[in-house]
Each structure stands twice: as structure tokens, then as C-alpha cells.
Amino acid sequence: MTQKIDYFFGLGSPWAYVGLDAFTALATAHLADIVPHVIPVIEENGGIYSRNRPPLRRAYWFTDLKRWANRRGVTLEFAGREALSDIAPAGDLVVAAWLRGDDWLALARAFHQAFWGRAEDIGAADVRARITTEAGLDSVSLEAFAKGPEVAARKAESLEIARKAGVFGLPSYIVVGELFWGQDSLPFLDSHLKGEKLIA
């Protein structure tokens, strides 16, 4: 039977970007279906945005992020990020792509690479359109669909699913009720999908 992985992430999460290729390779190896849920950090469940952490913890977070980026072979660009606009519309396009049966994963990867790898302003309509087109999707129709009720309903549904499942930080992965938080938990997710016992 095909296994399903509920994948909770946001384009604003550098950890989702850093772990994306490793996660998708894992899912492919297990022939698992990925069900995407584009959500924010859930503070009521204990999630903490990096900007709200104490300076020393934030400094360590930054160092660890760079370590993992190097380990995963991905580029991070932090210069000029303060000028970037709201990326929520780009996330809506990813949701829209999934709902329409388009290649949402290619689009999410393209947005991640643009936002975190090159510090592009994916909140800008013209930048979104270019990236969407380069990912092989129809940017005009997708933008129109993303503004519709189906996408709003799906976002609300995903957030409620995440809240009830105990998701707090991003990325998170759930397989049959078992929650794994963070891209550094992928080895545990791999073992779980193999049917291995993780807790004695």
C-alpha cells in the first residue's frame, strides 16, 4: 500500500528549503505520496519564529542553518533580505498548483531557491510570474485561481489539521499520526517508513 506523508512547510522557512531535496528523495525511495500543507509557524502549539528568539539562541540558529546548508549542498543568500516583500502570495500559488494537479513541488522548489538561494523578491507579482513560468506552469491562470475560495479553504483546512496534530515548527512531517519535526529528523522518518521501531 502506498504510504502518505503529510508535509507541513512554508516558503519562509529556510529549514524547509535546506531539507527539501533530501525529503523528496526519501519520499521517492519509499514510493510515498507527499500531501503538502502550506502553513505558518503555529505559536499557540509552541512554535517560535527565529526573530522572536533571544540573541544567543538566534546566533546559534544562524550558525546551525549554515552548517546544514553546507551539508545539504544548498546556497543561502542573506544580503538584502530586509527589502523583500510579503511572500504569502507565492505560498498561495503552491497551494493552487497542488489543487489543480500541477507540479506544485517544482514550483515550491523554484520559489525556495529564488527566495533563500538568491534573495529574490518572490512577493513581487512580476517575479512570481517569471518563476512560475520558468517552472512550467501558467502564471496568469494560476494567479487567478490562487485568489479564489478553494485556495483559502485549503489553507484553513491545512492549518486546522496541523493544529490538531500538534505541529508547531516547520518543516514537519506526519505519517499515520506520527509527527517528525525538522529536516534533521529525516533519518527517523526514513526508519519509520521502513517499519523500524524507533522507541524501545
What is the role of each PLM region?
Residues 3-6, 12-32, 106, 110-200:
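C-terminal cap of thioredoxin/glutaredoxin-like
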Residues 11, 17-115:
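Structural alpha/beta surface segment adjacent to cysteine/selenocysteine redox centers
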Residues 1-3, 74:
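Generic structural motif recognizing short loop/turn segments at the entrances and edges of beta-strands
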